[in-house]
């Protein structure tokens, strides 16, 4: 299975350059003639409308007509006056790549470009021309949202850190307010609540709301659109707010702590059903859901680590992905008042925490496929749809470039990875510990699943050096013990973080051999990209604070 596992949802790139000419209503002058027996005078009554729908009257709006307009002219103007004016987008899609900043989507783009480029060279590191044989790099293959009409950057700091968490940054995006890391839609004292854009659209404009995530639906980012808690870890209370929100569509990962931290409370799924939600746990039942079901919660059938959706690299082709949940969400939510849909690619963040570049790229591409569903929908509603793609923060300190590869990258090496670090832990490390498997036998699986070889041709870019083999052996020996990350010394933490020593060393070495590296197991302070397409897209050009994402959406949607 290639790392770049696509869902055949991408259109030709030309479809993505969707600069559309919009028909803007100009001022219409309505005239009536009052004839006098001796002298004639014309009276006018004018109405004007501008592109921002802020109508004003002035002398310049008044037009004096000395002759009666023809019947044809009056009819044409009357018809024009009946044309409905689009004042705000009817359909809004907000895609958030958790942990996705410039390095994540650029790495995915570069990787696709490398796979598609027959001249992409895996030569010895060199900045000269001698080893290139005339080959010329074609460059990255841009992800669909990288071709959007508008592109901006958002600063992500919160009230306590330049390297913030998902709770505070999602709060900024959803409400336009800063707060401390770990807090969801409340101020720094934990006493003042902030109303979210989704809540306002639901209440003020009767728009339907959808919330999708590849991780838990009561995790920090999705929770930021409906919950208000001083701690992001209050999963049960957040789950209760999910039900109380009355939002029409939730889909993706499962709920954490469904019976509370002590497993002594009423099941959240039962509470949801009592509140009128239809809850599904199988793909077959999810496929049967229609708009008539009104309020639904679709839990992915193939939940993996921590009851989240599988990593994209581990997903079978017949299993639903984020794009499928977006597609079903459109079916459920579409109505005359429109809808707002937030879709989170949450496992980008989890993969970056674990320093797994292969899984990171795969889940970034899964988010891109989900975006394509919205793009296809927007082609049917070009003047009514706004699509936004952004991140909440950067995770892992991912960088394209590594000291050991100098000025070169070997990104196609990543195609050798077949499974995520998480699946390797679950399906292989557990077996090794149970059976007392030797290091040499374990390395046979590593070669099959990650391409790293202990023996082979010296020109093979995935052939391990003696130094790398010793790193892997030391990590394996530690992983076979009852190790505890809490007892790590500083050197061990830098090498392994809180992850299985063997699996994280495997991904570190594969990353480095590909010309990729990470600097952290946590978040960083990089700005995130903001890409916009459709109604009001130009508002999102520029460099601004992440609270402005909310402010710009609120302005376009005319909410208080």
Predicted regions and their residues:
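Short, Lys/Arg-enriched N-terminal segments with co-localized hydrophobic residues
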Residues: 1-17
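Extracellular mucin-like PTS domains
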Residues: 55-76
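A post-motif C-terminal structural segment
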Residues: 86-91, 100-105, 109-171, 219-560
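Extracytoplasmic mature domains of secreted/periplasmic and thylakoid-lumen proteins
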Residues: 177-240
């Amino acid at each position: 299975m290639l790392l770049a596992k696509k869902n055949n949802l991408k259109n030709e790139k030309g479809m993505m350059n969707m600069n559309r000419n919009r028909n803007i209503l100009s001022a219409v002058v309505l005239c009536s003639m009052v004839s006098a027996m001796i002298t004639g005078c014309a009276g006018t009554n004018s109405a004007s409308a501008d592109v921002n729908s802020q109508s004003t009257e002035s002398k310049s709006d008044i037009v004096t007509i000395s002759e009666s307009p023809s019947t044809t002219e009056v009819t044409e103007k009357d018809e024009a006056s009946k044309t409905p004016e689009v004042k705000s987008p009817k359909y809004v899609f907000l895609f958030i790549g958790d942990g996705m900043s410039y390095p994540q989507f650029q790495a995915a783009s570069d990787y696709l470009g490398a796979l598609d480029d027959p001249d992409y060279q895996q030569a010895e590191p060199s900045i000269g021309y001698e080893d290139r044989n005339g080959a010329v790099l074609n460059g990255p293959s841009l992800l669909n949202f990288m071709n959007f009409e508008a592109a901006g950057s958002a600063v992500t700091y919160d009230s306590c850190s330049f390297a913030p968490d998902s709770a505070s940054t999602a709060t900024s995006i959803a409400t336009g307010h800063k707060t401390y890391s770990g807090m969801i839609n409340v101020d720094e004292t934990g006493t003042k609540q902030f109303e979210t854009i989704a809540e306002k659209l639901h209440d003020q404009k009767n728009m339907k709301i959808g919330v999708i995530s590849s991780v838990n639906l009561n995790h920090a980012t999705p929770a930021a659109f409906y919950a208000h808690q001083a701690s992001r870890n209050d999963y049960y209370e957040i789950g209760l707010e999910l039900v109380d929100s009355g939002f029409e569509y939730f889909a993706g990962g499962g709920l954490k702590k469904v019976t509370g931290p002590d497993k002594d409370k009423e099941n959240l799924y039962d509470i949801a059903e009592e509140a009128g939600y239809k809850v599904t746990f199988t793909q077959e039942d999810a496929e049967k859901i229609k708009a008539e079901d009104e309020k639904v919660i679709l839990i992915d059938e193939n939940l993996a680590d921590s009851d989240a959706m599988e990593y994209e690299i581990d997903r079978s082709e017949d299993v639903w992905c984020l794009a499928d949940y977006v597609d079903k969400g459109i079916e459920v939510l579409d109505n005359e008042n429109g809808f707002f849909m937030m879709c989170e690619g949450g496992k980008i963040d989890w993969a970056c925490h674990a320093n797994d570049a292969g899984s990171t790229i795969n889940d970034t591409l899964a988010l891109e496929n989900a975006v394509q569903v919205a793009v296809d929908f927007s082609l049917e509603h070009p003047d009514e749809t706004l699509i936004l793609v952004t991140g909440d923060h950067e995770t892992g300190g991912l960088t394209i470039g590594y000291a050991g590869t100098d000025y070169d990258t070997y990104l196609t090496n990543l195609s050798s990875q077949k499974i995520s670090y998480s699946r390797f832990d679950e399906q292989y490390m557990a077996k090794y510990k149970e059976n007392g498997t030797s290091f040499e036998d374990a390395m046979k699986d590593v070669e099959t699943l990650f391409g790293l070889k202990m023996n082979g041709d010296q020109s093979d870019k995935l052939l391990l050096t003696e130094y790398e083999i010793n790193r892997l052996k030391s990590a394996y020996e530690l992983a076979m013990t009852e190790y505890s990350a809490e007892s790590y010394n500083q050197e061990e933490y830098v090498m392994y973080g809180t992850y299985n020593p063997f699996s994280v060393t495997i991904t570190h070495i594969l990353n480095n051999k590909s010309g990729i590296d990470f600097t952290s197991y946590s978040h960083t302070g990089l700005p995130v990209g903001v890409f916009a397409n459709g109604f009001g897209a130009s508002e999102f050009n520029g460099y601004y604070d992440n609270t402005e994402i909310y402010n710009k959406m609120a302005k376009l949607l005319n909410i208080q």
